[in-house]
Amino acid sequence: MAAEKNFENKVKKFLKEQGCYFIKYWGGGAFTKSGVPDLLVCCNGYFVGVELKAENGKPSELQIHNLNEINKSGGYGILLYPEKFNQFKQLIWLLTYPFCNDECLNATDYFQENFYNQQVIINDIF
């Protein structure tokens, strides 16, 4: 749990440095919905839901479902492990780039193959 919290702090620090708005969501508690991504982020008008996992963490079926629903809705649902943090940073840099448009996002097919864990099927991201 400490490893995931340290990773979360690293991700939040990076997002703050990029000028992204984000909130930490504590799901599964009283009056909260389970399966919602850990971080709900807005970068340059783009919605990004980030489910953080430590190196050996495994997402629940509900977390996977919710990430896929975010992607189907036109947002970015991301299952993020520490070893993919550099690719995540590249995505956020693209989203926060002042002249980013659909063309620059569609040019990043690299992410689909190299960014996402095979446990999550993500369609129409890049």
How would you name each of these model-derived features?
Residues 1-126:
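Catalytic phosphate/metal-binding cores of nucleic-acid and nucleotide-processing enzymes, i.e., regions
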